[in-house]
A protein has these predicted regions:
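P-loop NTP-binding core
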Residues: 1-256
């Protein structure tokens, strides 16, 4: 049975989508069968994996409204070992369209469960907000991975996110756990990055991944080319760090 990991942080610009794309790609590169579920209406994970988000017939939006099956929503073999359930701006309307729908928080849970046995990992990219879509993603997931940018306001809003995770666990998904925290955009040249890492480690009781994702120009360039970092620049610091993170994620599952 595949592990379902939601990548979430309502604070934008923390490397959430970058992590969703590149962790997924590096898991696939390591021989894991991966499904990427893009639940962000911006659709940046979809386009960052080379899929034209404005030219797909079925997206998460159609799936949630019952207009297509989960199999019809999946684009297969976007990369070796990697499939995608795409998203685009239409998904922004789901919040209103699903008002009054019974058990709407469980829609993704029910649909993903139909195919989870086909995969080793299902990576769910959440929107940068604590919305119905985020709740849907968490209700469908086993764990939540939280990227935190190495900057002054790193912990801003994190307590609210953890509160939401605990609320979903209490009311909707009793098996939901924290996968852990991963530091992103680390700049070894600055004292601030080091201070942020030390501060978070001192104040956060959650699991923290050893791998730290550096601030890397090649990571920033890759999405505009529609490929993950391990394909865009296989030997870059960004590619190596996401390979290490993927290895940690794989072995954490084996250790449990």
């Amino acid at each position: 049975m595949g592990r379902i990991i939601a990548v979430a942080n309502q604070k934008g610009g923390v490397g959430k989508t970058t992590t969703s794309i590149n962790l997924s790609a590096c898991l696939a590169e390591a021989g894991q069968k991966v499904l990427v579920v893009d639940v962000d209406p911006q659709g940046n994970t979809t386009s960052g994996l080379g899929v034209d988000k404005n030219n797909v017939e079925n997206t998460i939006y159609e799936l949630m409204l019952g207009e297509c099956t989960v199999e019809e929503c999946i684009i297969t073999n976007v990369l070796d070992n990697l499939d995608v359930m795409p998203s685009n701006v239409n998904l922004a309307g789901a919040e209103i369209d699903l008002i009054g729908v019974d058990e709407r928080e469980y829609i993704l849970h029910k649909e993903i469960n139909k195919v989870r046995d086909n995969y080793d990992f299902v990576i769910v990219d959440c929107p940068p907000s604590l919305s119905m879509l985020t709740v849907n993603a968490m209700t469908a997931s086993d764990t939540v991975l939280v990227p935190i940018q190495c900057e002054y306001y790193a912990l801003e809003g994190l307590s609210q996110l953890i509160h939401t995770i605990n609320l979903v666990k209490k009311r909707l998904n009793p098996d939901l756990e924290m996968e852990g925290v991963v530091f992103t955009m680390y700049d070894a040249r600055t004292n601030l990055s080091l201070q942020v890492v030390e501060n978070v480690k001192e104040n956060l009781k959650q699991t923290i991944y050893k791998t730290i994702i550096p601030r890397n120009i090649r990571l920033a360039e890759a999405p505009s080319h529609g490929v993950p970092i391990n394909i865009y620049d296989s030997k870059s610091a960004g590619a190596e760090s996401y390979r290490l993170l993927a290895d940690e994620v794989i072995h954490r599952g084996e250790d449990e």
